[in-house]
Regions:
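Thiamine diphosphate
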Residues: 1-6, 19-139, 146, 150-362, 367, ...
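Short loop or secondary-structure boundary microenvironments that flank
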Residues: 12, 72, 253-256, 279-280, ...
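Short acidic, Gly/Ser-rich segments with clustered Asp/Glu that frequently serve as metal-coordination loops
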Residues: 12-18
Length: 480
């Protein structure tokens, strides 16, 4: 991979916190193929940027380890010269293009009124006159069109050359990129049954990743300074370092938002399935990029551990309450909360094959006893919800649970049976997938009893649609 990545950014973009996170990381890694074209016009929606910003951009960017080039953004020769210079750069580069917003507009040039509002028909006439532009709307002058076609032909030649190289190396490249997931998951399921151990689902995830990273070249892992807690780094990983990109694991530092944005970029590039870890409570720092993963239909996997009040000693600031409900409300996002090692394996399996849907794996810190002890070729977690226990053929109530609370639901079901109150327990690792099932299957799961109960160590909001108005929801609707 030797191509450049060009970023177009404005004044407002560089006020955002993610710009500091991402540029700091890029500078640290010396990403020489990264070039940012900064439209430096000193105007934002409210007015001049001086209302809110007095940064020394040159010092700021250079302190991150970036090269800085200042040019007149309206001078094509300066633009060309700067772009030529960055081709041999050893660092990421900012080309600060000093421009005037609304250029050519007699009444709105250099003003915030031209930022997000139409110029208006009368002002457009004045702009045409100012720029000596006599062509009809949407008419491309012949000279410009001719030059554009030349660029297209140049690109076509490069593409043809690349296709020829790919054709000659197709078998080798396809072998590198081929995912051998099916065999791995089949084996891991059998290992889980044979070992029959209690373990945290974050540990189950690590064991699954260990098997996947041993034989796979498409997974790019990482963590926001929590690798040892998220269990995202395996013994097979090689760390990506400055000037050494022949690796598959990124130490993102405490940069959750940038990590999520980088993973989106890796997925959009193609041939990679990125995953990154942090605590579930910090999913709020990742939220804008998680939403974009879903909106852009990218296969990005977020490993979110310490997923309930069972996380340990950190207290209410680190105990997720509303996070699961919020994440489950995002369209085209699969939020998985596995109950044991077998479910964790199946959740990973579904996440990796979801080419147009990102996934969140909500995992525990505390140990979970194995629940499913028989091998099944069927991925039950792909159904979103399934019956995991029934105390009698004819039952009185249905108990829904996810993750660490499934074992609690099973224990409660057995105790109720002693009092001749019979029930079935539904493990619901992914509400999003269950909602996509056929009506007949949903009726089978939901429609058997009038009395329904849900148990989850988090906000109860997202369970009410399953248990109904007469149901009971056991959860936590206050801070921990």
């Amino acid at each position: 991979i030797n191509h450049k990545t060009y970023v177009l950014a404005g004044d407002g973009c560089l006020m955002e916190g993610i710009s500091h996170e991402a540029m700091s990381l890029a500078g640290h890694l010396k990403l020489k193929n990264l070039v940012m074209l900064f439209d430096n016009n000193s105007i934002s929606i409210d007015g001049p940027t001086s209302l809110a910003v007095s940064d020394n951009f040159k010092k700021r960017f250079e302190s991150y380890g970036w090269d800085y080039i200042l040019i007149n953004g309206h001078d094509e020769k300066e633009i060309f010269k700067a772009l030529k210079k960055v081709q041999n750069s050893k660092k990421p580069t900012v080309i600060s293009c000093k421009t005037k917003i609304g250029y050519g507009s007699p009444n709105k040039s250099g003003k915030s009124s031209s930022h997000g509002s139409p110029l208006g028909l009368e002002e457009i006439k004045l702009v045409r006159k100012s720029l000596n532009w006599n062509h009809k709307p949407f008419q491309i002058p012949k000279k410009i069109l001719s030059e554009w076609k030349k660029i297209g032909k140049k690109g076509e030649k490069i593409q043809t050359k690349w296709d020829k190289v790919y054709k000659n190396r197709k078998k080798k490249i396809d072998k590198i990129l081929k995912n051998n997931f099916t065999k791995i998951f089949k084996k891991e399921k059998q290992v889980a049954i044979n070992e029959n151990k209690s373990m945290a689902s974050r540990k189950s995830s690590e064991l699954t990743l260990n098997a996947l990273t041993k034989e796979n070249n498409t997974l790019i892992g990482g963590s926001a300074d929590l690798a040892g807690s998220n269990n995202t780094k395996t013994k097979h990983h090689k760390i990506i370092k400055p000037n050494d990109f022949n690796g598959d694991y990124i130490h993102y530092g405490v940069r959750e938002h940038a990590m999520s944005g980088v993973m989106n970029g890796l997925a959009l590039h193609g041939n990679f399935i990125p995953y990154g870890g942090t605590f579930l409570i910090f999913s709020d720092y990742c939220k804008p990029s998680i939403r974009l993963s879903a909106l852009m239909e990218q296969n990005v996997i977020y490993v979110m551990t310490h997923d309930s009040i069972g996380l340990g000693e950190d207290g209410p600031t680190h105990q997720p309450i509303e996070q699961l409900s919020g994440l489950r409300s995002i369209p085209n996002l699969n939020v998985f909360r596995p109950a044991d090692r077998m479910e964790t394996i199946e959740c990973w399996q579904h996440a990796l094959k979801s080419s147009k849907t990102p996934s969140i794996l909500s995992l525990t810190r505390q140990n979970l006893d194995p629940i499913r002890k028989k091998y099944s070729i069927i991925n039950k977690c792909s159904l979103g919800a399934y019956e995991i226990l029934r105390t009698r053929k004819k039952i009185n109530l249905t108990i829904f649970a996810s993750g660490s609370e499934v074992s609690l639901a099973i224990e409660a079901s057995h105790k109720l049976a002693k009092d001749q109150i019979y029930s079935k327990v539904i493990s619901m690792p992914c509400q999003d997938l269950f909602d996509q099932q056929a009506v007949s299957y949903k009726k089978k799961i939901l429609g058997e009893t009038n009395i329904k109960i849900s148990i989850e160590a988090a906000s109860t909001d997202c369970w009410k649609k399953y248990v109904g108005n007469n149901g009971l929801t056991f959860g936590i609707d206050t801070f921990g």
